[in-house]
Amino acid sequence: MFKETFAAALLLTFSLTANAGFVKTDWKSSGDSLSVLHEETGKEWLSLTQTDGMSINQVIAQLGNGGTFDGWRLPTASEVEVMLQDSFLGFNLKTGKNTYMAEGYNDAYWKEADTYRKQMGGTDYRVVDGSYWAHSLGFHLDDTGTQLQNSGMNHFNWKATPRLYEFNIMNQVSVDSNNWDASSTYYGVYLISDGGTTLSSKLDPTLNINNPDAPINNVPVAYLLSGLGLFFLSLRRKQSKNR
């Protein structure tokens, strides 16, 4: 209870936004925008562009100390579900393939598709003879850690005149082959961090404060209190000087 109260005080003190959303962060270098923070959960997702074309097994081999994806982990299906639901508010997603059709030159779902593609990273984008395909899809495992699934979205038009658009939101769709060595140019692999992996979260650990498993929430309370006390002391001194 005390830790929760203290975390709330930190949120107010440093004026972090209370609105749930997705904000680009930097993974390795300033300005690379290769990760995204889900503010509501305090967890960060790696851009699918970094795992595009890889299999689950290839990614697993690069997790852990010294690997390409050191500090990242595979998300649970429940974490993917929360991310998808917050990405597509108002769609009332069911588990499986959610399909939406639109006809005419006013593409009803372009905004949602483009936002997600930019947010999570595009895994394929092509324009051929007036038709286009946009994919942002990723492999992950179900909550038992045994079944290969895919989630994300694809958006394309079937024909040019009249235009017929199809928008699919994939929510934990099981891969029939369950082959962990399967890979595709249309798919990446979802990776998530609890904090302290990206450059952004190293520079500002409070980015992950909404995640109870974040490093900032595992710092001894006495240490945090001393830091907060110094902050308020310096604030009081500044106020005294201005009187």
Task: Give the positions of each predicted feature.
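A short, hydrophobic C-terminal helix/tail in secreted or cell-surface proteins
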Residues: I216-R236
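Boundary/junction segments of secreted and surface-exposed precursor proteins
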Residues: A20-S30, K202-I209
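Short, structured beta-strand segments at or near domain termini in extracellular proteins/domains
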Residues: D176-K202
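N-terminal signal peptide c-region/cleavage motif recognized by signal peptidases
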Residues: S15-A18
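Positively charged n-region of N-terminal signal peptides that target proteins for export
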Residues: M1-E4, R237-K241
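An exposed tryptophan-centered "aromatic clamp" motif
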Residues: F69, S78-L164
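Short aromatic-cysteine micro-motif
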Residues: G31-F91, T185
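Sec-dependent signal peptide recognition
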Residues: F2-A8, V221-S226
